[in-house]
């Protein structure tokens, strides 16, 4: 949520900045008009309340003097009725103002590349050497299905499109990856959390998914509950409506959770493989910090995500997203994209964002500064990382000509010493068939 006082004071600044995110100038004008009307209505209400107080005094004076108080009583009642009408009008105006404010995205940070599409993202750095294959690299879904560790067909039978069964060493690889990620983040000072997977509408509003993006999630019929699209929601809402003790800042938390997304609007895109699923595991990083430290914390968070990829020895690059491609709540976002050999391109595996006080205002999450004054915290979130996409990148980058997959060295201890996935060892209950 943006600060209405700042919009009132600098309307042209907000029109210019939010235009880069697709917001029309008229939308800012509407907010300013509603804010002006609100202040006028409140002034009228205060004036009438003062008049009613004066009329009430006249009633007492008339009774003390043995005079008729009928006129003063009538005036008091009429003013009371008008105040009730104004209160109703204020309530309706506030609801409309709140709704329009809730649909305005965060202001992009200076230097964020300006574009209403994803085109124009700026590459910050490229890390790792892209492997030169002496054979035609296969897609991860073909590798996984050939080894028997990924079963999309049976998942389709049981659940539908965009679901998968991980089997045998495939399931162990997924588990190895997310356990490795969590361990690495805890080394960097993050506290592991196991949060709820179902949240209420207030939580979805707090992190900015509601009201604008309801079509992208799974809601429980007949209840004010939603399956989380990301652990960002329960992690960031942990302190909703609270004042965080200053000595606790900055707070770093991390969690592994499933993420549930309807993928509305994704028809025809990434219909095969692990890239775009309705249910997938993701390790999330969330930070609460003082405003003066949030940009440094964004760089640290991005480095935390990069650390995983470096230790897995997976080639990737880091880009700054455009104004039109950032998430609704972000002021700046750094994306990490993994190299996928079979697709011959980079694919997103992490987004690290500084949301400034945008989410904190929606959640009413504050701290006290050195003068004891309440201030909004800044919140940051980042994937650390999307597990399925990381597994997909491992399958493609570590594949061998015979169809086997070598396990990244750092994951071997998490795989109980297994160094390679082959048809012979991939799925134990099929071993007798493969032998």
Curated annotation (Swiss-Prot):
Biased composition (Basic and acidic residues): 49-68
Enzyme Commission designation: 6.1.1.11
Annotated spans, Disordered: 48-68
Highest taxon of the lineage: Bacteria
Database matches in Gene3D superfamilies: Bira Bifunctional Protein, Domain 2, Serine-tRNA synthetase, tRNA binding domain
PROSITE patterns with a match to the protein in the record: AA_TRNA_LIGASE_II (PS50862)
Residues reported in the UniProt entry to bind ATP: 261-263, 348-351
Binding sites annotated in the UniProt record for L-serine: 230-232, 284, 383
Record SUPFAM superfamilies: Class II aaRS and biotin synthetases, tRNA-binding arm
UniProt keyword terms in alphabetical order: Aminoacyl-tRNA synthetase, ATP-binding, Cytoplasm, Ligase, Nucleotide-binding, Protein biosynthesis
Localization (cell): Cytoplasm
GO biological process, one term: selenocysteine biosynthetic process
Top-level EC class: ligase
Cross-referenced Pfam families: Seryl_tRNA_N, tRNA-synt_2b
Pathway in which the depicted protein is active: Aminoacyl-tRNA biosynthesis; selenocysteinyl-tRNA(Sec) biosynthesis; L-seryl-tRNA(Sec) from L-serine and tRNA(Sec): step 1/1
Function comment: Catalyzes the attachment of serine to tRNA(Ser). Is also able to aminoacylate tRNA(Sec) with serine, to form the misacylated tRNA L-seryl-tRNA(Sec), which will be further converted into selenocysteinyl-tRNA(Sec).
Complex formation: Homodimer. The tRNA molecule binds across the dimer.
Protein name in the entry: Serine--tRNA ligase
Species of the source: Limosilactobacillus reuteri (strain DSM 20016)
């Amino acid at each position: 949520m943006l600060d209405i006082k700042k919009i009132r004071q600098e309307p042209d600044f907000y029109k210019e900045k939010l235009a880069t995110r697709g917001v029309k100038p008229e939308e800012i004008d509407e907010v300013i008009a509603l804010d002006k009307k609100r202040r006028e209505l409140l002034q009228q209400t205060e004036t009438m309340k003062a008049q009613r107080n004066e009329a009430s005094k006249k009633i007492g004076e008339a009774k003390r003097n043995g005079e008729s108080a009928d006129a003063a009583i009538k005036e008091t009642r009429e003013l009371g009725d008008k105040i009730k009408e104004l209160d109703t009008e204020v309530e309706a105006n506030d609801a409309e103002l709140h709704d329009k404010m809730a649909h305005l995205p965060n202001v992009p940070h200076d230097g964020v590349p300006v574009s209403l599409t994803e085109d124009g993202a700026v590459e910050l750095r490229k890390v790792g050497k892209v492997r030169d294959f002496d054979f035609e690299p296969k897609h991860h879904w073909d590798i996984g299905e050939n080894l028997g560790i990924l079963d999309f067909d049976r998942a389709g039978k049981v659940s539908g499109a965009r679901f998968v069964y991980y089997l045998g060493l495939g399931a162990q690889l997924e588990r190895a990856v997310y356990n490795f990620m969590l361990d690495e983040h805890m080394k960097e000072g993050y506290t592991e959390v196991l949060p709820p997977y179902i949240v209420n509408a207030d939580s979805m509003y707090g992190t900015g998914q509601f009201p604008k993006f309801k079509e992208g999630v799974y809601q429980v019929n007949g209840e004010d509950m939603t399956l989380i699209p990301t652990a960002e929601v329960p992690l960031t809402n942990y302190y909703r409506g609270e004042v965080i003790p200053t000595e606790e800042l900055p707070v770093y938390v991390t969690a592994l959770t499933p993420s549930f997304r309807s993928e509305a609007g994704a028809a025809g895109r990434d219909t095969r493989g692990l890239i775009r699923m309705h249910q997938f595991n993701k390790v999330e990083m969330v930070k609460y910090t003082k405003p003066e430290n949030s940009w440094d914390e964004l760089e640290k968070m991005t480095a935390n995500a990069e650390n995983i990829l470096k230790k897995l020895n997976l080639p990737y690059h880091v880009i700054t997203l455009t104004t039109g491609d950032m998430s609704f709540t972000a002021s700046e976002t750094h994306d990490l994209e993994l190299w996928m050999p079979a697709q011959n391109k980079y694919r997103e595996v992490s987004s690290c964002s500084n949301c400034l006080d945008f989410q904190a205002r929606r959640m009413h999450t504050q701290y006290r500064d050195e003068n004891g004054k309440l201030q909004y915290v800044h919140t940051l979130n980042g994937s650390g990382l999307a597990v399925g996409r990381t597994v997909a990148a491992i399958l493609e980058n570590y594949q061998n000509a015979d169809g086997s997959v070598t396990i990244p060295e750092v994951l071997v201890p998490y795989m109980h010493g297994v160094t390679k996935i082959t048809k012979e060892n991939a799925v134990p209950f099929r071993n007798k068939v493969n032998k």
